[in-house]
Regions:
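Short alpha-helical segments that sit at the start of domains
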Residues: 1-20, 70
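Short amphipathic alpha-helical interaction segments
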Residues: 45-55
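Short, cationic-aromatic polyanion-contact patches
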Residues: 65-83
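A short acidic, leucine-rich amphipathic alpha-helix
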Residues: 37-39
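C-terminal flanking helix
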Residues: 57-64
Length: 83
């Protein structure tokens, strides 16, 4: 099964959008993401992003997501999980 099908079956549509966004960022060399910028880029509210990132930090097998900082919007550290 390819990654897109697995993501669409395992996560909500919003969570799938966020995961795809994070994977693209990781590919570009980023590992820190602010909720407000994710929200702006994906057309979501920062609260919606924060809620889903907190959920994903506990259930996402592909990415290691941790809350990193709270100053001027929550910053999340995202790393690929070891296989």
């Amino acid at each position: 099964m390819n990654d897109k099908n697995r993501i669409s079956e395992q996560y909500t549509a919003t969570q799938g959008k966020i995961i795809s966004y994070l994977v693209q960022g990781l590919t570009a060399g980023k590992q820190y993401f602010k909720s407000k910028y994710i929200a702006k880029d994906l057309g979501l509210s920062p609260k919606e992003v924060g809620t889903n990132m907190a959920i994903l930090s506990g259930i996402c097998d592909e990415l290691d997501i941790s809350r990193w900082s709270y100053s001027n919007s929550t910053t999340w550290r995202v790393l690929p999980r070891s296989a």
